[in-house]
Amino acid sequence: MLSVNKKALEIVNKMIENKEEINIDVIKLENGATVLDCGVNVPGSWKAGKLFTKICLGGLAHVGISLSPCECKGITLPYVKIKTSHPAIATLGAQKAGWAVKVGKYFAMGSGPARALAKKPKKTYEEIGYEDDADVAVLCLEASKLPNEEVAEYVAKECGVEVENVYLLVAPTASLVGSIQISGRVVENGTYKMLEVLEFDVNKVKYAAGLAPIAPIIGDDFAMMGATNDMVLYGGITYYYIKSDENDDIESLCKALPSCASKDYGKPFMEVFKAADYDFYKIDKGMFAPAVVVINDMTTGKVYRAGKVNAEVLKKSLGWTEL
């Protein structure tokens, strides 16, 4: 079986080798663990954001960045593009931000391949039927502070590996790399909703592609949390190839999948978050989805499209000024 941690390590080694070119720093902790600073005390770069995103996806996706008008009328933004032939493993088995790393006063949302070793959360791996037995652990952290030896020891223990085989990549939300990697979750937002909300077997998704605008740096981590979410919810476009069986209603799946099917749709994420008393659990889970969904039912040959790009909400979210 494919090892997302071993695949990711190949990319990590390239980042370490080219650290000066891609504006990152590499720190060797006293216990032997390796930290890659991709935006805390360094600027990062487009290339670092691209590679960070690819690592999040367990090395099982193509990641590209371009400047494209796409469907966002009146808004010009860079876009991240994702293509994968292993959608369930890459997005849910690796990329999903399913590990809240809390050690002492340190907190970060963890995503990427190491989750497959620690089985965070276990149910996800049971549902997609995937496990990794690598002797290295690669974890991506969304945080504004770098982890210490204690954090690395915790990750090593949870993953069942030696601490010197732990690699921790860190990027704040309010950084170029952080913004890129969050928009790079556009395909994962769809597979997440399929599995967690609509209870659809994501192993039937054979190929997937998507693109989403990359949020400008408009403020601190809290402000960027809103902007980065909006890029996917109101600007993300996805395409899924599904091998259905006779019991699947793919038309209904497509109709229910985009963010506009949610009762909380229509306002910038920060407004929705505020109305929910800043409690994620009060927000409709169905809102966390791409703006546009296209599904090719490979069994019937039919193609369905649902959702829309909402340029007005994107402009409002970013405080867009047209001169």
UniProtKB/Swiss-Prot annotation:
Coiled coil: none annotated. Keywords: Cytoplasm, Hydrolase, Methanogenesis, One-carbon metabolism. One of its GO terms (molecular function) is methenyltetrahydromethanopterin cyclohydrolase activity. Its EC number is 3.5.4.27. It is an enzyme of class 3 (hydrolase). It is found in: Cytoplasm. It comes from the Archaea. InterPro entries: METHMP_CycHdrlase. It catalyses: 5,10-methenyl-5,6,7,8-tetrahydromethanopterin + H2O = N(5)-formyl-5,6,7,8-tetrahydromethanopterin + H(+). GO terms for biological process: methanogenesis, from carbon dioxide; one-carbon metabolic process. Pathway: One-carbon metabolism; methanogenesis from CO(2); 5,10-methenyl-5,6,7,8-tetrahydromethanopterin from CO(2): step 3/3. Catalyzes the reversible interconversion of 5-formyl-H(4)MPT to methenyl-H(4)MPT(+). This is Methenyltetrahydromethanopterin cyclohydrolase. The gene is mch.
